[in-house]
Design a protein with these regions (language model features):
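Beta-lactamase-like hydrolase cores
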Residues: 6-38
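A common structural microfeature
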Residues: 30-32, 44, 63
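Residue-level signal for well-ordered, solvent-exposed loop/turn and beta-edge residues enriched
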Residues: 40-41, 86
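Amphipathic coiled-coil signal-relay and dimerization helices
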Residues: 41-47
């Protein structure tokens, strides 16, 4: 547990008893909480076990899978880049990145951030690709080989792989990971 400075408000709002009650009610094995004030972490604490079977406690540094919550972060970063004029939702990706290539010429020339963010690329989920098996730049190169499940923009097909590539676009624009 880390507590810095005056954090009595954080402690009042986030009581240990409340957290433990919620964990028990929802059958949550562990949770980590951080409170940030003025760009500084004023409280960081973990509860429960990261490994219940072996009774290994969670710590503030325990990493948790956040699954599709990352899509909110990714789309927010893209919105910020659009707001800054560094990207446009409706400009084809290939205009920013000439090495962008999809399964056919039409999709390659027309695909925009709007298409990617709204799951309208026509690509099947290909979920096995996004689970830490390959890095983003390799996935970028392999995009051209992924087969569609529907014609481009014909229907919405939920796609984790495309969101991984949207994150890669943000990395390429900002130079940050």
């Amino acid at each position: 547990m880390i507590h810095k400075g005056d954090n009595t408000m954080a402690q009042k709002c986030i009581s240990k008893q409340f957290i433990e009650n919620e964990m028990e009610f929802w059958k949550i094995p562990s949770v980590a909480i951080a409170v940030v004030k003025d760009d500084e972490i004023v409280m960081s604490e973990a509860f429960g076990y990261k490994d219940v079977e072996n009774k290994i406690p969670a710590t503030p540094k325990t990493q948790y899978g956040i699954a599709s919550c990352s899509k909110s972060f990714t789309s927010t970063i893209i919105a910020m880049l659009v707001d800054e004029g560094k990207l446009d939702y409706d400009v084809p990706i290939i205009e920013y990145f000439p090495d962008f290539k999809m399964y056919d010429e039409f999709a390659t020339k027309e695909c925009t951030l709007r298409d990617m963010l709204s799951h309208r690329t026509g690509l099947a989920p290909h979920d096995a690709l996004w689970i830490d098996t390959i890095d983003r730049s390799t996935l970028w190169e392999r995009l051209r080989y992924l087969k569609p499940m529907a014609p481009f923009r014909a229907q919405t097909l939920y796609n984790n792989t495309i969101y991984t590539l949207i994150g890669h676009i943000a990395e390429k624009i900002t130079g940050q990971t």
